[in-house]
Amino acid sequence: MSVRVLIRKPTPADCQELLALHHRSQEFHHPWVTPPLNERDCQDYIDRCHQADFEGLLICHVANDRIIGVANFSQIFYRSFQNAYLGYYADVDFAGQGLMSEGVRLAIDYAFGILKLHRIEANIQPENRASIDLVKRLNFTREGFSRRYLKIDGEWRDHERYALTVEDWH
């Protein structure tokens, strides 16, 4: 199988391309995720990617380095927990092509290999079937249901909780 995507850390030079992706995909992302829609918030996101408890990765097309999605690991804990929360989203122009599955797979390899995490958790709204299907393809296990778990777009939303450990990854 040929490699179609790569992952890399965002830089300030990526801000305009990210903003264009976010605006183009805004309706597609609603109500699942609300990425930055202005330059200040985008720069804040890129700055956050340099903090110890957060790792943001761009998923890019190998052919032209175009950003086709984002994978984030937030609230990274070490010591006896070694856990992070995974969030991701795609550019609407590349949805449904399997590129995000490939990119998130690379991001998980990075989290277990480079970040030395033991466990990754993904919390997904039950109506977001595409995202649930993605984590299931990647061998995540459904662990439970969290009522009114996150406030997104001004509303507290239910989520299904999925997790993957390094032992189940390889």
Language-model segments: residues:
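Acyl-donor (CoA/ACP) binding surface of acyl/acetyltransferases
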Residues: M1-E17, L21-Q26, C60-H170
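Conserved GNAT-fold acetyl-CoA-binding loop/helix
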Residues: E27-I46
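A generic secondary-structure signal
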Residues: Y45-R48, Y110
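A short helix-loop-beta-strand connector motif used in the catalytic cores of GNAT acetyltransferases and
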Residues: D47-L58
